[in-house]
């Protein structure tokens, strides 16, 4: 796994490309667009203490709330109090950056999963490359859509399950991790079932 320098350089190049595709001009699209009028808004409602009804489990909304809060704590962000803002006044970058980060991290995750199954560096690099350039994953990573959390936690769960089959030490820890991650998948949206 990443045994030689050439493989490591190619993997890092794919990761750099993935970050570039997801973060370049991330805040340029004025928001909220598409389903961003729902998911990040509900996260914002958690921050402001506003009551609302939501049909899905709350993890994605908690993550959006954390994303907005962390972004607004940055020293170069000049904001008086988040309670005084309306959702439409938020910088779209505040609720999109976490999706872009997790979408970028899908590439090494896909590499490690493919390597855990097939034990072939070249195949794992191809899988990682296709995850980096996949159009659907790019859209889900660049907009505040909850689907990227399902994919990220789901692929992490599969990786842990694959590791449990080849673990030299006690595989129960890998299986327990896989179960916790599957619980996170279900706590994002019901279609995670």
Specify the residue positions occupied by each region the protein language model found.
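Start-transfer (signal-anchor) and selected internal transmembrane alpha helices
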Residues: 1-21, 105-109, 115, 121-126, ...
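Short helix- or helix-capping micro-motifs
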Residues: 15-18, 127-132, 139, 159, ...
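Transmembrane-helix motifs of polytopic, lipid-linked glycan transferases
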Residues: 12, 16, 85, 89, ...
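Membrane-interface transmembrane helices that cradle and orient dolichyl/undecaprenyl
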Residues: 1, 116-118, 157-175, 185
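Interfacial juxtamembrane loops and adjacent helix segments
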Residues: 52-100
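Transmembrane signal-anchor helices characteristic of membrane glycosylation enzymes that use polyprenol
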Residues: 6-36, 48, 184-185
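Transmembrane helices and adjacent periplasmic/lumenal helix-loop junctions
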Residues: 136, 141, 176, 180-193
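Short acidic/glycine- and proline-prone juxtamembrane loop motifs at membrane-interface regions
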Residues: 33-34, 136-150
């Amino acid at each position: 796994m990443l045994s030689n320098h050439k493989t490591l350089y190619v993997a890092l190049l794919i990761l750099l490309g993935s970050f570039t595709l997801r973060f370049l001009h991330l805040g340029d699209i004025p928001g909220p667009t598409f389903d961003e009028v729902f998911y990040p808004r509900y996260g914002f409602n958690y921050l402001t203490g506003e009551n609302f009804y939501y049909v899905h489990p709350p993890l994605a909304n908690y993550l959006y709330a954390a994303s907005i809060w962390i972004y607004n704590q940055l020293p170069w962000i000049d904001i008086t109090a988040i309670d005084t803002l309306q959702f439409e006044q938020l910088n779209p970058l505040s609720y999109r950056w976490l999706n872009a980060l997790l979408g970028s991290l899908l590439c090494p995750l896909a590499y490690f999963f493919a390597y855990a199954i097939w034990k072939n560096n070249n195949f794992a690099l191809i899988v990682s490359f296709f995850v980096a350039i996949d159009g659907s994953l790019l859209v889900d990573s660049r907009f505040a859509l909850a689907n990227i959390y399902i994919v990220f936690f789901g692929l992490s769960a599969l990786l842990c399950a694959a590791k449990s089959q080849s673990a030299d030490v006690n595989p129960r820890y890998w299986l327990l991790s896989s179960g916790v991650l599957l619980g996170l998948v279900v706590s994002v949206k019901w279609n995670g079932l």
